[in-house]
UniProtKB/Swiss-Prot annotation:
Pfam families documented for this protein: Glycos_trans_3N, Glycos_transf_3
GO BP annotations, alphabetical order: L-tryptophan biosynthetic process
InterPro entries listed in its UniProt record: Anthranilate_Pribosyl_Tfrase, Glycosyl_Trfase_fam3, Glycosyl_Trfase_fam3_N_dom, Glycosyl_Trfase_fam3_N_dom_sf, Nuc_phospho_transferase
Protein name per Swiss-Prot or TrEMBL: Anthranilate phosphoribosyltransferase
Chain residues that bind anthranilate 2: R170
Annotated residues for binding of 5-phospho-alpha-D-ribose 1-diphosphate: 84, 87-88, 92, 94-97, 112-120, 124
């Protein structure tokens, strides 16, 4: 028997779990626009208050993937998504976007799934536009971009049209809900490997186990203990790693890789223009904190993509990709390739 929205709401009020098949049904109602905004708002708020379970998040992500416009990638060896939940409040430049260029220059294929800034001063879509990249591509054009340049940016609104049914509710609520953690779980290119940053330490263990249930191959979920949704230079980083079906949780420190622990304060930006400048300086091999944090994250992404056998090996490859100028060249390559699809 299917659950009604009213029954689901009662379940959340009593702090009881909504089971997998029930959650599939509820999410399909939301994504089709068949649930009233009042009930949708009540349920997603109730889930947040009770705390979403791994099973509930897995079911919700499964439905979001069902409704997505997919990008078909033929060869998914060394294929990785580099993404953050956002919402860490750090207002740093776009580290994961810079990481994409370095990882691609070092031999990974990257399908980056992102959006405009909501909580940040500059989302991945904003800085890519500032770099001259056309972000408004159709799924088959993104696939061509990945095949040709080793990189593809999937602008979330183009791939999740059903989200428009819940967008006004989310906007009016103005608080974090399950949808804030679903984005990184719903890559439209189905990248089997992932470096995922999260905004809360509890999400490290949760998100990596959701990815395990969703059938991912090699995933590193990270949370910098200074609050960053990246691998941090300013503190230890909590890691949840899925590899060969097994989950391991551990901490890493910059010193483990011969790097100095240094505050991330200098990485703050006010807008996409400032983010662009800092990103290009890092990729241009300008010594400093920006280059180091991009190197650290790219090394981790290359390990996740199975291009490198360890994070340390990945960092070495990332250093070479930046020093050789290949990482900086990737920016112009992506801009050139995507501009041909300008509508």
């Amino acid at each position: 028997m299917t659950i009604t929205p009213q029954e689901a709401l009662q379940r959340t009020i009593e702090h009881r779990e909504i089971f997998h098949d029930e959650m599939l049904h509820l999410m399909r109602l939301i994504m089709r626009g068949d649930m009233s905004p009042v009930m949708a708002a009540a349920i997603i708020t109730g889930l947040r208050v009770k705390k979403e379970t791994i099973g509930e998040i897995t079911a919700a992500a499964t439905v979001m993937r069902e409704f997505a416009r997919h990008v078909e990638v033929e060869d998914n060896a060394n294929f990785v998504d580099i993404v953050g939940t956002g919402g860490d409040g750090s207002h740093t430049f776009n580290i994961s976007t810079a990481t994409m260029f370095v990882a691609a220059a070092a031999g990974a294929k990257v399908a980056k799934h992102g959006n405009r800034g909501v909580s940040s001063k500059s989302g991945s879509a904003d800085v890519l536009e500032a770099l001259g990249v056309n972000i408004d591509l159709q799924p088959e054009q993104v696939a061509a971009s990945i095949a040709e340049t080793g990189m593809g940016f999937m602008f979330a609104p183009n791939h999740h049209p059903a989200m428009r049914n819940i967008a006004p509710v989310r906007r009016e609520l103005g608080v974090r809900t399950i949808f804030n953690i679903l984005g990184p779980l719903t890559n439209p290119a189905d990248a089997p490997n992932q470096l995922m940053g999260v905004f809360h330490p509890d999400l490290v263990g949760i998100q990596v186990r959701v990815m395990q249930r969703l059938g991912a191959r090699h995933v590193l979920v990270v949370y910098g203990k200074d609050g960053m949704d990246e691998v941090s230079l300013g503190a230890a980083t909590l890691v949840g790693e899925l590899r060969d079906g097994e989950v391991r949780e551990y901490e890493i420190h910059p010193e483990d890789f011969g790097m100095q622990m240094v505050s991330n304060r200098t990485l703050k930006v006010e807008n996409a223009g400032e983010s662009r400048v800092m990103l290009l300086e890092a990729l241009g091999n300008k010594p400093g904190v920006a280059r180091e944090i991009v190197t650290l994250n790219a090394g981790t992404a290359l390990y996740s993509a199975n291009v490198a056998g360890s994070i340390a090996d990945g960092i070495q490859l990332a250093r070479e990709a930046i020093a050789s100028g290949r990482a900086r060249e990737k920016v112009d390559e992506l801009a050139r390739f995507t501009q041909q699809f300008k509508r």
